[in-house]
Swiss-Prot record:
InterPro entries reported in the protein's UniProt record: ThiC, ThiC/Bza_core_dom, ThiC/BzaA/B
Ligand binding (substrate): N69, M98, Y127, H163, S185, R186, G187, D226, A227, C228, R229, E265, Y292
Family per record: Belongs to the ThiC family.
Keyword Nucleotidyltransferase found: no
Record-level GO cellular component terms: cytosol
Binding site for [4Fe-4S] cluster: C409, C412, C416
Domain of life per record: Bacteria
Protein name: Phosphomethylpyrimidine synthase
Gene: thiC
EC number: 4.1.99.17
């Protein structure tokens, strides 16, 4: 039996090789997985032309996944530098990479990325439009925006961020409800500017059905972008954000009618006490579609440390139902991330995702922690390094500060609680001041 997309196959009762791969990785019953793909609760971004893909699932009952943003820009156009980041992201087992390239040899970089990456690849096609057409924003036609999406889809991109919820109604709500930081989504601000300059409807909203035809043809998952995501905790959960979320819910149903998989993008900057409610709102208004959040960043005062503010928010968001975390690096709000910035962002995001999985009782999530605790109890340093989320750093810290005795560290020495409890439980003397027999 033929099928067009993962959702189409699932609705026809078919199990694809991508579904089998996801079920195996997650330890989920294949029929439960297939049913959740059929109803849109799980998305498996898997473009038919991405031949190196090792498919992952995003959504209900699955591990929280993380995405890494990278790409070339006018100020940093070196492709090799970004490809080094790609290789590192893959080594660190990021499940997704988004190419946010906006200038230079974007097509060359994107094709290299798709060819080499087993991780799912996402793009924001509007970023590429200005450079691709070599036109000022207001001179790009609606059809040209759509054509860039098709170009990315043909090349093998697994998911595309489309800010279709910023229509004239959403724009009117934004105008009536002033914000401290206006529109901070790059793609959203570009579309809003295009709409204002041309006095026209958002082309991604007006020609949404055409976009869905493209996504269905190549099995591209549509990641509905949040143009009105809050860029400060002051603007969180305001009228513009919620109005757009309601539109995204309507667009979700239209996509599912065409068997196109959907993810919903979310905040953004948000105080801790608003995060749980926002997860409920998205799942309710967008019919249980997977939720993909940037952070949330829980305070605005920490430039240089936003991988931490983001990890705090990401852990809370994941514990309350977010399915996919976009990493944030220490360079957020300051510069294009370096390779080291990227590593720190990945680690912080992976910690947040795992902490969320423990809280929402994803099967097997606690096993890793229990194994680490057992290794600590046994003072098995090699096992601890092997299990660490960042083995290199854990090993380096111990080697930089060697203890006198191998069964302790330089923090506690022979007063180590693990060491002493092990000895006492075995009926031995702890010998803090004397050498062991």
């Amino acid at each position: 039996m033929n099928y067009t997309t993962q959702m189409d196959a699932a609705r026809k009762g078919l199990v694809t090789k991508e579904m089998e791969a996801v079920a195996r990785k997650e330890g989920m019953d294949i029929e439960i997985l297939r049913e959740r793909v059929a109803t849109g609760k799980i998305a498996i971004p898997a473009n038919k032309n991405h031949h190196s893909l090792d498919a992952e699932g995003i959504g209900e009952g699955l591990r929280t996944k993380i995405n890494v943003n990278l790409g070339i820009s006018k100020d940093c156009p070196n492709i090799e530098v970004e490809l080094d980041k790609v290789r590192t992201a893959l080594e660190m087992k990021a499940e997704a990479i988004m190419d946010l390239s906006s200038f230079g040899k974007t097509e060359e970089f994107r094709k290299s990325l798709i060819e080499m990456s087993p991780a799912m690849i996402g793009t924001v096609p509007i970023y590429d439009a200005v450079g691709f057409y070599d036109k000022e924003l207001q001179d790009i036609t609606a059809q040209e925006f759509i054509d860039v999406v098709e170009k990315h889809a043909k090349e093998g991109v697994d998911f595309v961020t489309i800010h279709a919820g910023m229509n004239q109604e959403t724009a009117a709500v934004f105008k009536r409800n002033p914000r401290l930081t206006n529109i901070v989504s790059r793609g959203g601000s570009l579309l809003y500017a295009w709409m204002e300059l041309n006095k026209k409807e958002n082309p991604f909203y007006q020609y949404y059905d055409q976009l869905l035809e493209i996504c269905e043809k190549y099995d591209v998952t549509i990641s509905l972008g949040d143009a009105c995501r809050p860029g400060s905790i002051h603007d969180a959960t305001d009228a513009s954000q919620i109005k757009e979320l309601m539109v995204l819910g309507e667009l979700t149903l239209r996509a599912w009618e065409k068997n196109v998989q959907v993810m919903i993008e979310g905040p953004g900057h948000m105080a801790i006490d608003e995060i749980a409610a926002n997860m409920v709102l998205e799942k309710k208004l967008c019919h249980g579609a997977p939720f993909y959040v940037l952070g949330p960043i829980v305070t605005d005062i920490a430039p240089g440390y936003d991988h931490i503010t983001s990890a705090i928010g990401g852990a809370i968001a994941a514990s309350h139902g977010a399915d996919f975390l976009c990493y944030v690096t220490p360079a957020e709000h300051l510069r294009l991330p370096t390779l080291e910035d990227m590593k720190e962002g990945i680690i912080a995001s992976k910690i947040a995702a795992h902490a969320g999985d423990i809280a929402k009782k994803v099967p097997g999530a606690r096993k890793w922690d229990n194994e680490m605790s057992r290794a600590r109890q046994q003072l098995n340093w090699e096992k601890m390094f092997e299990l660490a989320i960042d083995p290199e750093k854990a090993r380096r810290y111990r080697e930089e500060s060697k203890p006198e005795h191998d069964d302790s560290c330089t923090m506690c020495g022979k007063m180590c609680s693990m060491r002493n409890m092990n000895k006492i439980m075995e009926g031995k003397n702890i010998n803090i001041l004397r050498e062991d027999d």
